[in-house]
């Protein structure tokens, strides 16, 4: 398979001029990102790399970070985690308050904001320094100590994060938050501010394509059954209320973020990351969705 030729074809066929969406504006720092940015990186099971465009430029990964924190929480709690979270697609916007009242404070899945905040509560409760340990986890699975939080983005999120603060308070009132609100939202804003490139993300997500092992060293990080559950959740819940569309068009487990990044995996084959900050009405990268659909069409390879 000539992945580089396929990526070059995608790069030639697509442009930011072809999409009509907008860069995220509700977080002030994200609104400053150049809408022309576009990059893609494929990391294969034989350790080959293929890329184009702005694939080495860091951006705010936002909700993609929820996959990392879920993996950490599952290592800590195992199956007991699902006493506090459900595993169903939500069908509502990612920051919705509505479902919580009807479902007694149990978030519909770990990738909507309410679910990710319950995960944050668990990590704040059980880890001595959750910010440090999350960064160490991501650096380890990526093999790159240059990954960092973007302090400016974290502060920008905090300045406008009233709905997330409301979510934590509401879940706490319903009995599914243990810690104080402030450290939970502080950790959450920092995790979303993680700055990574497509190249780094494709390497990090290879553990989900490689049965929980770091490809280069074969070190076991996650149990295979943990990876199976995370991949299933990415397939059904990884794209806000557009998960069905992504499965239909692309056909792989993946996760998006409002920073414009998308990561997807084909188990035992590759991990692919794409970044374009222009979002569609559902908060997913418009050009990224199109690029990944074209990628699986041209390769003829998906999980279906």
From Swiss-Prot:
Source species, domain of life: Bacteria
Binding locations of substrate: 63, 113, 157, 164, 188, 240, 258
Catalytic activity, reaction form: L-glutamine + H2O = L-glutamate + NH4(+)
GO molecular function, one term: glutaminase activity
BP GO annotations: glutamate biosynthetic process; glutamine catabolic process
Hydrolase keyword on record: yes
SUPFAM superfamilies, sorted: beta-lactamase/transpeptidase-like
Gene3D superfamilies, alphabetized: DD-peptidase/beta-lactamase superfamily
Subunit structure: Homotetramer.
Protein family membership: Belongs to the glutaminase family.
Protein name from the UniProt record: Glutaminase
